């Protein structure tokens, strides 16, 4: 696609502003301020999308609420990565039929990745008659127009156009907390891993202009945000569609040059596009957290090929060795799928072997979940769920032992942390994160929330560190 076809035009955005104005006028005529609720499921990209949805709703005159019974508009911002997430959404939709029965003028909207799938839209159309609006992630910038259509035409609206996707800039955003910020740098995916639904629901890769991203980050740092996470389905592909040599490492360096007291992170990364240039840039940039999330998915070359992951185990290990050589002490995390169709026990154990040899700090582990419409969903899968569960538990046990050992090594150390909220542990009331994104529950004054602090680590377990604030 030409760049001009990727960017939503000023005229189109102006049209949405006009519908925003009309919605605000309608809401201003109400006897009370209308309430809206956005419930987000899934990944950080969905969280960022949810912040835009909340921003648009607020500009339309809605106040935000968490009370489904009081909300005039409810948006379920959904995830399609795993079957479990979809089941949760359908269960939630079923419960909302009762809130709508008690409040008939309530508008219920399904958006996010689930909504982009025709099979889901058809199911909602035929079985969830209380849902008024369905719009996929590529149409979310048109929320004011579509919501106006629901209200004024008194009909159900479905917008799941199967387009490659575009970029709508300068949309309003509501960020909560004021400490951590998510910044989308690109959208879509071109990789088509055989198990993944994302390219089908998010469209093709399209990068935001670097100037727009840098400007947004500069504003966040000026507002006092202490951590910025750059988001994309594959940030390592950033810039390939810009028509220049400018790449993700260049963007990272440019943001790092902004003065301030902050950490810079990014996710997600595809190993096939990870470069030594990126690792070198991470190493020399003071604000970039020395933490790398690089999903390997499998330790078996045959399975990687079946997954359409174009790298080998040896290549992955080579990348990690280089990254660790230029960033000693780097925190490394990854994703792994166990039980891919056709995978044997020996192949699954190759993944366990990779985990034990690589010594990840943490691992996000999943049993294969078939996604309708993907090649993997059609593959022969003779292994039972029960047998896959046995393999999965061996993987989890191996990683838990590694995580516990790595966390124990922090005991007695004093580390810089970002205090970002309250803990659910009364004995350690503060929740913080290290530069490597390790959770720290600690003792200290709640006035520290939103600031960097020094924490002395006194204890640990598999999942967290424990400590206390110390004076610098």
Where does each model-flagged region fall?
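Short flexible coil/turn linkers enriched for glycine and charged/polar residues
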Residues: 176-179, 189-191, 288, 298, ...
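Conserved SAM/AdoMet-binding glycine-rich loop
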Residues: 105-110, 117-119, 222-345, 356
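Proteins enriched for Cys/Gly/acidic motifs involved in redox and nucleic-acid/cofactor modification
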Residues: 1-238, 277, 292, 314-325, ...
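Radical SAM enzyme [4Fe-4S]-AdoMet core and its adjacent flexible, acidic
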Residues: 43, 239-260, 307-310, 370-401
């Amino acid at each position: 696609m030409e760049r001009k076809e990727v960017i939503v035009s000023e005229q189109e955005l102006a049209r949405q502003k006009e519908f925003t104005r009309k919605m605000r006028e309608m809401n201003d005529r109400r006897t009370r301020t209308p309430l809206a609720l956005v419930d987000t499921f899934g990944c950080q990209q969905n969280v960022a999308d949810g912040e835009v949805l909340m921003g648009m709703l607020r500009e339309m005159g809605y106040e935000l609420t968490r009370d489904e019974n009081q909300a005039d508009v409810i948006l379920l911002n959904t995830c399609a990565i795993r079957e479990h997430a979809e089941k949760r959404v359908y269960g939630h939709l079923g419960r909302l039929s009762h809130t709508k029965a008690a409040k008939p003028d309530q508008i219920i909207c399904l958006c996010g990745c689930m909504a982009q799938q025709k099979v889901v839209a058809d199911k909602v159309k035929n079985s969830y008659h209380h849902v008024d609006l369905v719009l996929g992630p590529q149409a979310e910038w048109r929320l004011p127009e579509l919501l106006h259509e629901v209200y004024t035409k008194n009909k159900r609206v479905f917008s799941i156009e199967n387009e490659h996707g575009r970029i709508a800039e300068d949309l309003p955003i509501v960020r909560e907390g004021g400490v951590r910020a998510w910044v989308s740098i690109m959208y879509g995916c071109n990789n088509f891993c055989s198990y993944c639904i994302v390219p089908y629901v998010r469209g093709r890769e399209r990068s935001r202009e670097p100037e727009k991203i840098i400007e947004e980050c500069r504003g966040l740092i000026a507002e006092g945000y202490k951590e910025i996470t750059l988001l994309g389905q594959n940030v390592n592909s950033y810039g390939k569609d810009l028509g220049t040599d400018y790449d993700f490492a260049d963007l990272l360096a440019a943001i790092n040059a902004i003065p301030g007291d902050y950490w810079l992170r990014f996710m997600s990364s595809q190993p096939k596009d990870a470069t030594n240039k990126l690792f070198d840039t991470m190493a020399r940039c003071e604000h970039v957290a020395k933490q790398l999330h690089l999903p390997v998915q499998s330790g078996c070359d045959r399975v990687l090929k079946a997954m359409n992951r174009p790298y080998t185990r040896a290549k992955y290990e080579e990348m990690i060795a280089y990254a660790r050589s230029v960033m000693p002490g780097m925190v490394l995390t990854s994703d792994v799928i166990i039980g891919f169709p056709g995978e044997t026990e020996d192949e699954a154990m190759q993944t366990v072997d990779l985990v034990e040899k690589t010594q990840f700090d943490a691992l996000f582990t999943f049993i294969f979940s078939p996604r309708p419409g993907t090649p993997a969903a059609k593959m022969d899968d003779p292994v039972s769920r029960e047998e896959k569960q046995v393999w999965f538990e061996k993987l989890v046990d191996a990683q838990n032992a590694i995580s516990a050992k790595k966390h124990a090594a922090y005991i007695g150390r004093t580390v810089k942390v970002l205090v970002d909220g309250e803990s659910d542990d009364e004995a350690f009331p503060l929740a913080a994160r290290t530069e490597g994104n390790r959770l720290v529950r600690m003792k200290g004054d709640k006035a520290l929330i939103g600031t960097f602090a020094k924490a002395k680590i006194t204890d640990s377990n598999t999942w967290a560190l424990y400590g206390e604030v110390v004076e610098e």
